[in-house]
Amino acid sequence: MSVHSSLREHPNWPRLVTLVRELAFIDGGSDDAFTLASGRNSRWFFDTKPVMMHPEASHILGELLNLRMDEMGADFVGGLELGAVPLTAIAIATADKESLRRGFMVRKEPKGRGGRKTNNPPGIEGSSL
């Protein structure tokens, strides 16, 4: 996976890299320390939740997410629960106040109760995501 050059060249990119190294990177000390979602074992693990919950890191994430989404012309930002929820909230909270971009999330299973079972905003169909 690569990072778009517009993000790597941003003045806040080096600081975000430092924060990710400090907050998310875990060296377990042995090759079988962590079992990954794929079932494979790894010595290393990235837990990005602390990055998303850190004030400075989340501000930089939001700035860079919005920069890239502006370049792409995205109308909406979101993804699969639970992982996409913090990033979606960061992106929406740091967007320009005049931004028309809206957030959404995709549930793994229907909630089965409540009024809007998908939590998606009206008009999302056919929009640029």
Language-model region placement:
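Active-site-facing substrate-recognition patch
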Residues: 2-72
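Short coil/loop linkers at secondary-structure junctions
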Residues: 26, 75, 98-101
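Conserved hydrophobic/aromatic pocket- or pore-lining residues that grip, position, or stack substrates
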Residues: 39, 77, 103
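Gly/Ser/Thr-rich beta-alpha loop segments that engage phosphate groups in nucleotides
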Residues: 41, 81, 85, 116-117
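Fold-independent oxyanion-binding glycine-rich loops
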Residues: 48-49, 80-81, 106-109
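Glycine-/small-residue-rich active-site loops that bind phosphorylated ligands and cofactors
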Residues: 53, 83-84, 111
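Short glycine-rich phosphate-binding loop at a beta-alpha junction
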Residues: 73-83
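Short, glycine/charge-rich flexible loops or terminal/linker lids adjacent to PRPP-binding catalytic cores
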Residues: 88-129
